[in-house]
Amino acid sequence: MRDLLDFYASAPLLELGHEADRVREAKHPHGVVTYIVDRNINYTNVCVADCGFCAFYRRPKHGEGYTLSFEQIGEKIEETKALGGVQILIQGGHNPYIPFEWYLDLLRYIKRHHPIHVHGFSPSEVDFFATRFRLEARDVIRELRGAGLDSIPGGGGEILVQRVRDIAAPKKAGADRWLEIMELAHGEGMKTSVTMMYGIGETLAERLEHLERVRALQARTGGFTAFITWPLQPENTPTMSHMPKTDAETYLRTVAIARIVLDN
């Protein structure tokens, strides 16, 4: 890991990018990359997780809190499909007012009236459901899948190092729990994506630790289909508005080292 850390921190950007491209080409030699057209739908912004980096959420009973109706979500799906979209990413805050059956009914409604691939309910949400409704996480996943959930997004991953999570999101599923839920989903035959949000006070070594933990799980299950990374957007966040914004080179270096580490 020390050599990787030195390479990530110190190698010229073009050298780092060239190595990342070499790894990519070894796996995909025909010069073809793929993508999908999808849309994020945040079904509620009411949340009790109180993450320091989140400018989106509103506490319960806040005047700006909302929960979308099934019909509003259906309209957004139809707008997506009209533009060529093939998937929706549906996720939201940890809303203590929504019963578990609502989520199951929503999935059934979507599949019945607006059929589309539903990529939804991150490990953090699954953990919240399990705690809130006194269920095992595996049973939450099975119930959601049975109602129509197709795959699970990597939301709530942030940095999978507990020191960082204790500062940025102490009320949300911890690093081990996040990985555990992903492994449970893979064990149920579900594919998932994985994310990393950086710039929240972690070190470069902790970013690499995040990637190494993801790589180890992928080696066991093969269940991850995509990795997405992005920097903190500090404006209007509860506790991180003072954090410096990272630059474009940091983003390119982070994408490159992720391609090198996540070669499986």
Language-model segment annotations:
Residues 8-9, 35-41, 58-64, 89-101, ...:
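Glycine-rich, proline-tolerant flexible connector loops at the mouths of alpha/beta enzymes
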Residues 38-39, 57-71, 124-136, 167-172, ...:
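Active-site mouth loops of central-metabolism enzymes
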Residues 70-77, 134-143, 211:
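Short, acidic/polar
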Residues 51, 86-88, 100, 104-197:
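Radical SAM/AdoMet-radical enzyme domain recognition
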Residues 50, 54-57:
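Cys/His-rich metal-chelating microdomains
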Residues 92, 113, 118, 146-157, ...:
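Conserved C-terminal portion of the radical SAM core fold
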